[in-house]
């Protein structure tokens, strides 16, 4: 039996619309990462981008369990000496609601050029409105 490899011409990409209202952050992120990688398709090939486009709306209404809304902290470094910066989940959602979902999904994708290509297919919006109506995204339930 031969190993199956998807051909770029045979890869069919869909646009999926996911509503993040009252969804748990980590559980939503794992599902989205699987869709972006294409692992939900029978023609999944590890060295190719076979995933679909994902549009997430209502990112500001994402849920976290326990005390994480106040206690969860995101860190980044500016590159300067002593340049470590931190922001709580609560402040991040208040200022840039889409970044919490983007960071969670990005951490679940490969840290390679292929992973960066997969991440570009993720579109996250704070509210209900999104500019991808022309692509006719299908509602996807998680």
Swiss-Prot record:
GO terms for cellular component: cytosolic large ribosomal subunit. GO terms for molecular function: mRNA binding; structural constituent of ribosome. Keywords: Ribonucleoprotein, Ribosomal protein. One of its GO terms (biological process) is negative regulation of translation. SUPFAM superfamilies: Ribosomal protein L13. Transmembrane segments: none annotated. It holds the Pfam family Ribosomal_L13. PROSITE patterns: RIBOSOMAL_L13 (PS00783). It comes from the Bacteria. InterPro entries: Ribosomal_uL13 (IPR005822), Ribosomal_uL13_bac-type (IPR005823), Ribosomal_uL13_CS (IPR023563), Ribosomal_uL13_sf (IPR036899). PANTHER family: LARGE RIBOSOMAL SUBUNIT PROTEIN UL13M, RIBOSOMAL PROTEIN L13. NCBIfam families: rplM_bact (TIGR01066). This protein is one of the early assembly proteins of the 50S ribosomal subunit, although it is not seen to bind rRNA by itself. It is important during the early stages of 50S assembly. Belongs to the universal ribosomal protein uL13 family. Part of the 50S ribosomal subunit. This is Large ribosomal subunit protein uL13. It comes from Francisella tularensis subsp. holarctica (strain FTNF002-00 / FTA). The gene is rplM.
